[in-house]
């Protein structure tokens, strides 16, 4: 499979991500007893977004010098589209985390610890999923049609099917975990495991971490095929995806207090998924350029946010 990713680009990306992760973990480790404040979350969100844009600029410059301006423009638009897609779809992931932390009564200072390991695990799992997906696409090009159909069905289902409101503790997988793993009734600070009466017990914190990882894999099943609709270049797919999820922890603490106000978001995301699915299904008849995909995704998100603001204002007026 043709890829813009040269050893220099792969190496630069790996070094940059490693340095930023170590810096982030080092700074957060000094404040492990504190919850991330809204201000800290905002600062880190700006840092991660700025770093992503700087990477896009560096990618454009490198491609311009090596393969020409046209390819540079195309690759950067693909990166930005993938990044925006992942950021948008990740908001739903944030809502699931909020429900998990609320159900298991995890305090904010311990949420930070869970999300640190959660994001690190997501990096590993998504890397494996993306390379597996790239291999499948390179071997079986028709699989893109399956991705497209899956995204179209998922988009329609997201808009029309009512969400499952049953308690998290009643979910089959949670019941299975509790039946097969010794879990303490109470939290033990930041510890994932404790010994009681000579036996090793898991704390509720490790249960939440497992569920956080599972939720990320479930959402990745939607987001990764969506990015393959934009580009099949594994370098662009991986870098756009990882840059988006690296800022996910900061996004969580940024949105935690206002999550209930995003009532219309799922409809916007459903339209995006349906659009991407249709784009993949009609690829042989009509090719939507990358710039068109980027514009469509950005426009759908913008319209969704405007409608969301209007709905919230209307509800506030009705409640007065």
Curated annotation (Swiss-Prot):
Record-level GO cellular component terms: plasma membrane
Keyword match Translocase: no
One matching Pfam family: TerC
Cellular localisation: Cell inner membrane
Keywords: Cell inner membrane, Cell membrane, Membrane, Transmembrane, Transmembrane helix
Main location (coarse class): membrane
Membrane topology category: Multi-pass membrane protein
Entries under InterPro entries matching the protein: Integral_membrane_TerC (IPR005496), Integral_membrane_TerC_rswitch (IPR022369)
Superkingdom to which the source organism belongs: Bacteria
Transmembrane portions of the chain: 3-23, 41-61, 88-108, 114-134, 136-156, 199-219, 226-246, 271-291, 292-312
PANTHER family: MEMBRANE BOUND PREDICTED REDOX MODULATOR, THYLAKOID MEMBRANE PROTEIN TERC, CHLOROPLASTIC
Family: Belongs to the TerC family.
Functional summary from the UniProt entry: Has been proposed to be a redox modulator.
NCBIfam families reported for this sequence: R_switched_Alx
Name of the protein this chain belongs to: Putative membrane-bound redox modulator Alx
Species, as recorded: Photorhabdus laumondii subsp. laumondii (strain DSM 15139 / CIP 105565 / TT01) (Photorhabdus luminescens subsp. laumondii)
Gene name linked to the record: alx
